[in-house]
Amino acid sequence: LSREQLTSARASGVGSVVMFGATTGRDGIGGASVLASQELGEDDADKRPSVQVGDPFTGKKLIEVSVELIESNLVESLQDCGAAGLASALSEMAASFGLDIHLDRVPLRQTDLEPWEIMISESQERMVAAVTPSLVPAVKEICARWELPCTEIGTVTDSGVLRCFWNGEVIGDIPARFLTEEAPRYQLELAPRSKQDPPPAPVGPAFRQALLELLASDNIRDRSWVFERYDYVVGSRTVRRPGLDAGVLRLRPSLRGLALSLDGNGRIAWLDPRIGGAHAVLEAARNVACSGGEPLAITNCLNFGNPEKPEMAWELSEAIEGMAQACEALGIPVVSGNVSLYNETDGQPIYPTPVVGCVGLVPDVRTIGSAWREGDVVLLAGAARLSIAGSEYQALYDKVGGAPEEFELEAEAALIRFLWKNNHLFSIAHDVAEGGLAVCLAECAIFSGVGAHLDIPTDPVQLFGECGGLAVVACAREQVSKLEADGVPLREIGTAGGDSLNGLPLADLTRAWQAKEASSEEI
């Protein structure tokens, strides 16, 4: 899609409002809007909404229709029906003008829906568009060709009011701007949580046992039992499968690719939500860069406890600030996002967990490396102040506590640039994340099927500490001089080769990493 074809969600003038896609049912009524705005307990079964029923085939047709309508210049604005359904979509569309909407014209899956149910239903695969009246027949013709229902449900007006009709009678009206720019804002009380006392350094087992146990831990072990349940090569565009940093899809007909990653660490955010928010953004961007992509944008899901409690509100505010600082340092926008609040059980909140998805552009998918080769030079890129606080090592062998190290955002941005700019020279690039340097190196060996002889520290903090700012890269000896470090520290730590990692058999590492497969009850 070219920049010129980007379509606003807001109406830009008087015209018709059409709705196309799936029919509207009771599935998801009050879904995301309820779950994100109140606590639910054992006595609230009546508040638990029915789950939205997704239909990937209809979703694919909806995408194709939307693209064709945009390319044909048939729509003035376009908006999907997400959380809060039509109530949200129409509010955003009406913000600068007004809308008259006839809810009795909305195609229904169940004929006995009441008007308020139609407004807040979160049935999937539905779009609304503002269309010049003379172009409505052309819009309907395209929808019919794709076998998607399309109905004119109202008009864009210049009244500045969103009005809802039922069988010709006005049943609700409200100034449109009151639902958007002039909506009441929460004024939440913020109370910083007391700092965690740093616990003594955990006393873990010897290096070999610690590494094997970390590889088998829930947050690090092989994830293929999850993604192999889905067709991750559908469309035959998958260049790099899930499992190593970011997945990559080819953007046909060119050789460019789209790298996608998803990251979050609730333990880090619990110890320091500002650092945790930045951590999620930076790790997602590093993963994209390790896969050859220049990070372009992020989306997010903010998973927190009850924001009406001052400490929880402070966690949310701090995490958002950390994410904003990281995005500014990287020069990337937040293009979408959602929240999941009030996540508590018997008054105990979940870890504050900002989750970030990042997308990046790969110039040439043919150059992406996924395995080091015999004789490759192994380098450590970056310089970070590592910490055991909030690490997988600490969680495995002790109580989580202490303070994670602050990020040096300029250094992080420089490392990410180094990773994607030089990726065509790497046989593999992998960021140091959960499990620290030791796990990063073990994963490189496992993915490559080749061991390595490395000069690595023996201190547990240097081996298993976390907090970003580091990546392992490998390349042929003759390529080292071609690397454009641009101020990023580079240190040669060894050579790939053999069937062990510093004497630890590759077969043992792989066996530990693949040993635990979740039962159906865990999924």
Spell out what each predicted region is.
Residues 1-146, 152-165, 180-182, 186, ...:
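Mobile "lid/hinge" segments at catalytic clefts and subdomain interfaces of large enzymes
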Residues 18, 260, 379, 491-494:
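Hydrophobic/aromatic beta-strand patches that form the interior of the parallel beta-sheet core
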Residues 7-10, 30-31, 190-339, 343-438, ...:
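Non-catalytic terminal/interface segments that mediate subunit docking, oligomerization
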